[in-house]
Amino acid sequence: NNFAVATTRGAFVCLLNNDIEIIDGEWLSELMRQACRPEVGAVGARLFYPDRSIQHAGVSVGMGNAAGHAHRGLPEGDPGYFAHALVARGSVAVTAACLVVARELFDMVKGLDEADLRIAYNDVDFCLKLHAAGLRNIYAPSAVLIHHESKSRGQDMAPEHRARYLKELATLQDRWDTTRFRDPMHHPMLDRACEAYRPVR
């Protein structure tokens, strides 16, 4: 991503995975509507799995002592916790599978950490850098796309993949203290281990 961004000349950049399917011609306009506001950092879309359940509706930092996708698996049309899945709102982080940000801000935080966070959590780290700089990251549900990421991704943990993941998890936890991080968008009485926003029992 950093290499690709370095070749661009536009005022804004869009990070977009190659497994994203565009289903609505207005998606980029909807993201730009938020990204051009001066107080905004990164803007992320509402992403569905091919079965139209939610893959991404913002990222909650501290979930699982790291970060998790809000409302993952929620059926299309279900508003989720206080309509979080359906309304534009602040989100401490959003996924880089589909993300728009001003090029100036991308450069300001030195882009994604592709050295210590080569695969996992580099987007969370990127958004946390923007958040720490006083910018507001936004989840924009009016931008809707399909993400052909397998629901079981991450369960395929060959020893070398698991070792890399654990190292990157430790980097995120050490850098941002995510084991104790209190996401202002995630009520303290909600279970930090659950992406479905269930109350603590």
What spans do the regions from the language model cover?
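Short, conserved alpha-helix that lines the donor NDP-sugar binding/gating region
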Residues: N1-A6, C127-L128
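Short, high-confidence coil segments that cap the C-terminus of an alpha-helix
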Residues: G10, P38-V40, L135
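Short aromatic/hydrophobic "clamp" motif used to bind/position activated sugar donors
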Residues: V13
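Catalytic metal- and UDP-sugar-binding loop of GT-A-like glycosyltransferases, i.e.
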Residues: L16-N18
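Conserved donor NDP-sugar-binding/catalytic core segment of glycosyltransferases
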Residues: I20-N65
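A short, conserved alpha-helix in the catalytic core of glycosyltransferases
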Residues: W27-L31, A85-K110, A115-V144
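C-terminal, non-catalytic tails of nucleotide-sugar-dependent glycosyltransferases
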Residues: G41, D51-R52, M63-S91, V100, ...
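Short glycine/serine/threonine-enriched helix-capping/active-site loop
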Residues: V43-R46, A140-P141, H148
